[in-house]
Amino acid sequence: MNDSAKTATIYHNPRCSTSRNTLKLIEDAGIEPTVVKYLETPPSHDGLRKLLDDAGLRPSEAIRKKEALFKELGLATASEDELLDAMVANPILIERPIVVTDRGTVLARPYEKVREIL
């Protein structure tokens, strides 16, 4: 029996090479994913919390610490809840891509990590 993923959703930033490479791997696996351009349609607070929980990640593990806004907002000493709030308010801070399939959820960094759930 084939236990490969049948469906996929990618939280995608087309300007990010890692996100583009991840999308290509999904498509090369024969899956036509749902593409969520999260900068245009960001997840809700509860939606982002669920994505991170499903991936086994804390907000501090899924926030873009090198993004200028991270420093501008003084987030280095923020709590996990404060980081999540900042990510919802400023989706550019969300590390990408996050991929959800019927086999699990991963932050696909490096992009090959998506193979774990395909």
Residue ranges and their predicted role:
Residues 38-118:
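Thiol/selenol-based redox catalytic cores and closely related redox-interacting motifs
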Residues 2-29, 33-38:
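Local sequence-structure signature of Cys/Sec-based thiol-disulfide redox active-site neighborhoods
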Residues 1-2, 89:
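Intrinsic-disorder/low-complexity regions
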